[in-house]
Swiss-Prot record:
Name under which the protein is recorded: Small ribosomal subunit protein eS32 eS32z/eS32y/eS32x/eS32w/eS32v
Pfam families given in the database record: Ribosomal_L41 (PF05162)
GO biological process: translation
Membrane-spanning intervals of the chain: none
Classification lineage: Eukaryota, Viridiplantae, Streptophyta, Embryophyta, Tracheophyta
Record-level Gene Ontology MF annotations: structural constituent of ribosome
Entry keyword set: Ribonucleoprotein, Ribosomal protein
Family membership noted in the UniProt record: Belongs to the eukaryotic ribosomal protein eS32 family.
Length: 25
């Protein structure tokens, strides 16, 4: 069960990181 929400959270974190990187550049 924990792995399921963890995978979903990881995907969201990755998307947020991409946006942050674009803002940095």
């Amino acid at each position: 069960m924990r792995a399921k929400w963890k995978k979903k959270r990881m995907r969201r974190l990755k998307r947020k990181r991409r946006k942050m990187r674009q803002r940095s550049k």
